[in-house]
C-alpha cells in the first residue's frame, strides 16, 4: 500500500493520508445495494453498538469466501478498494469464464494466477484443505464449518499459523493469540491478508471518520450521573469509584466478555491474549 501525503494547504490535508494506488470500479453483476438501517440498533430500535450511524452509502461486493472453483486456474485482473472492509479485494477471471472477488493476499499483483483444490501448490493465494498443508504454513480466510466458507482471519493484515495436526483436527494459532482446534477437512487460503499498513493511515479530520459511519466517543467523566457512572461532580471531578466501569456499571478493565458454556469451549486450547 502506497501512502500519499498532500501538500499542506489546510489542517485536514496536512494531517491526512490516502492510498494513491487502489481505486474502486466494481463489476455490476458482483455488487448489490443494501438498506442502511443499522445505526447500531437492534430490531427494537435500542442501541446495542454505540458510536455508529450515518456514513456514506455503500454497495456490497459479493466476496467468494468458499473458493469452490476447484482445480480451475484464475488470474488476478484488478485490485480494488472495498468500503465494507479494511482489506482490499481482487477480481479473479477463471478459465471457465467465471468472475469472482476474493480477499487480496499480501504481495499478490495483477497478472498472478491462483487455484483452489485438494492437491494444489502451497503458493500465496491458493486455497486448499488444512490436511494438505505442511506445518508452519501462514494462512487466512479459514473455515470453521466445512463448506460454509472462510470466517476466521479475514481482516487487513490478519494471518494465522498451522502449528499441529492430530487425528481429525488441526491446531491453529489465530491472530488474537488464541490457539484452537479446527477440522482438518476445512479449507484455508495460503498467505496473509493484504493492506497490512491500514493502521498507519491518518484520517486527518473528523469528517473522514463520519464518512465511515463512526460517531464521536464521549468520555463518561464529562457526562451527567444519569448517563454514566463516572458522571457528575463539581468541575473536574474524579470518577468516584475504585475502578473504572462501563456505562452499565460493570468493571471496564479485565472483565471477560465471552459467554459461558459455549459449544466451542472444548475446541479452544488457549484463550486469546490481551
From Swiss-Prot:
Region of interest (Disordered), residue spans: 1-24, 223-274
Keywords annotated in UniProt: Chloroplast, Plastid, Ribonucleoprotein, Ribosomal protein
The keyword Ribonucleoprotein appears for this protein: yes
GO cellular component, one term: chloroplast
Residue spans of biased composition, Polar residues class: 7-24
Keyword Ribonucleoprotein among UniProt keywords: yes
GO terms under biological process: translation
Annotated localization: Plastid, Chloroplast
Superkingdom, natural source: Eukaryota
UniProt-listed SMART domains: Ribosomal_L2, Ribosomal_L2_C
Any one GO molecular-function label of the UniProt entry: rRNA binding
One matching Pfam family: Ribosomal_L2
InterPro entries given in the database record: NA-bd_OB-fold, Rib_uL2_dom2, Ribosomal_uL2, Ribosomal_uL2_bac/org-type, Ribosomal_uL2_C, Ribosomal_uL2_CS, Ribosomal_uL2_dom3, Ribosomal_uL2_RNA-bd_dom
Annotated SUPFAM superfamilies: Nucleic acid-binding proteins, Translation proteins SH3-like domain
Family: Belongs to the universal ribosomal protein uL2 family.
NCBIfam families tied to this protein: rplB_bact
Subunit structure comment from the entry: Part of the 50S ribosomal subunit.
Descriptive protein name: Large ribosomal subunit protein uL2cz/uL2cy
Organism: Nicotiana tabacum (Common tobacco)
Lineage start: Eukaryota, Viridiplantae, Streptophyta, Embryophyta, Tracheophyta
Name of the gene: rpl2-A
